[in-house]
Regions:
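N-terminal edge beta-strand
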Residues: 41-69
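Non-cytosolic beta-sheet module surface loops
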Residues: 54-56, 76-80, 114
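Soluble periplasmic/extracytoplasmic beta-strand elements of cell-envelope proteins
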Residues: 51-53, 73-75, 88, 123, ...
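Beta-strand-rich interaction surfaces with strong enrichment in secreted/lumenal proteins
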Residues: 61-64, 96-101, 110-111
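Exposed beta-strand and adjacent loop surfaces of beta-rich binding modules
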Residues: 71, 82-86, 119
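Histidine- and aromatic-enriched segments that form or immediately flank copper-ligand environments
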Residues: 77-104, 131-139
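Extracytoplasmic entry segments of secretory-pathway proteins
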Residues: 2-51, 147
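Extracellular/periplasmic metallocenter environments
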Residues: 33-37, 102-147
Length: 147
């Protein structure tokens, strides 16, 4: 490889590295490794509200931060489509036991008050026979409870 070709390859590599933060931030809708974080704020009525959309093996946002001992309302919907999805967070030790058996395009609201700081996974529990689970395909996220 001559010097000019090496320079072109190096330049292209540098371009990819520099543009990755702009174009490669990732969207959980298209990149299962992308993280979209939302920090809930407490409304005037003292409730933390977050809207989550589920779809083609993603949740958006897929990282939600809430405060302990403050009521939470999650409004969970599904993008239009044929594939069934659900939503589950199981952490009874922290006051969290959420299960929406079938997501819909109309919002379904779940209410709970987390009592213990920690990171708790939320997942789609659906799995077709002989296929990866929806969780394994990227339909998972984290509910982080802070003090």
């Amino acid at each position: 490889m001559n010097t000019h070709s090496k320079s072109l390859v190096a330049g292209f590599g540098l371009l990819l590295v520099l543009t990755a933060p702009v174009f490669g931030q990732g969207d959980p809708r298209t990149d299962p490794k992308a993280v979209k974080k939302v920090v809930a704020t407490v409304d005037q009525d003292g409730v933390q509200r977050v809207a989550i959309v589920g779809g083609g093996y993603f949740y958006d946002p897929n990282y939600v931060v809430v405060k302990a001992n403050v009521p939470v309302e999650l409004s969970v919907t599904k993008e239009a489509g044929m594939t069934p999805h659900d939503f589950a967070i199981k952490a009874p030790e922290a006051g969290i036991d959420v299960a929406i058996k079938s997501l819909d395009t109309k919002p379904q609201v779940v209410k709970f008050t987390p009592t213990k700081a920690g990171k708790y996974p939320f997942i789609c529990t659906k799995k077709m026979v002989f296929m990866q689970s929806h969780k394994d395909k990227g339909m998972q996220g984290v509910l982080e409870v802070t003090e």
